[in-house]
């Protein structure tokens, strides 16, 4: 029997890439707020995350088997300017989804972040003490705790992903590829490190964890710690573009930005040990990203 997966934040980058990744093996519904989307083989439905009762009714009537909570307020600068809004969206609404799933006994995949630490140490595991440095990180850390309190069997995923973006929301890799193809120079940070994973790879790994009935917190990231600058260099290499257009820059020199952790890299070994496989390096993910463009996936998402 095909599982029915309901994805909140259905117009977002992660939701769109996730839906395409699993649509051949799952019945997928994208939960939408304002932005309308249309993807072949994927259902859509308007949803109100403000109401637990509404969520219970929607999940129940649609026959949902798994809920992926991918909605969120992710603009770090905007979160700092509007902390109440960030708190409401990232914490309260996430808790509403958790309560609804708990009431119905549904598996919940809650998408968290890697912006949870001070950024002074590399490759942190799930047991390290959280020390977020900005409003966005603080709201995501709080959400993790409330979600697990409301629905202890939830699967909380700390991650940092890349994939193809839409016409209304470019991804980081879109920005790099677009700039290089236009012959424009761009500056990327050499002092910011992370462990990015392709959204498609993330989706596959998470659903395998669901099959294993895993719960609790997991770092679902790539296996390679890399700077934003070197990520751009690797994109240029894989896509056959001019890496000379990428210039090194330092986040530490950009004093006007909201504070961010310099090192967001996470260890994925807990997940890898349970899955019985590694999750690949940056080049693996970028080669697949390139293949996705060739088979039309970038265009399918990009025209939305």
Language-model features and meaning:
Residues 4-23:
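N-terminal Rossmann NAD(P)H-binding glycine-rich loop of SDR-like oxidoreductase domains
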Residues 8, 188-193, 218-226, 274:
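Glycine-rich Rossmann NAD(P)(H)-binding loop
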Residues 49-89:
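NAD(P)H-binding glycine-rich loop region in Rossmannoid oxidoreductase-like domains
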Residues 81-109:
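NAD(P)-cofactor binding segment of oxidoreductase domains
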Residues 88, 92-93, 103, 116-157, ...:
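Catalytic helix-loop patch of NAD(P)-dependent Rossmann-fold dehydrogenases
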Residues 145-194, 201:
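NAD(P)-dependent short-chain dehydrogenase/reductase
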Residues 205, 212-256, 297-304:
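Mid/C-terminal beta-alpha module of Rossmann-like enzyme folds, strongest
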Residues 227-233, 250-289, 293-302:
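Conserved C-terminal active-site "lid" loop/helix of NAD(P)H-dependent oxidoreductases
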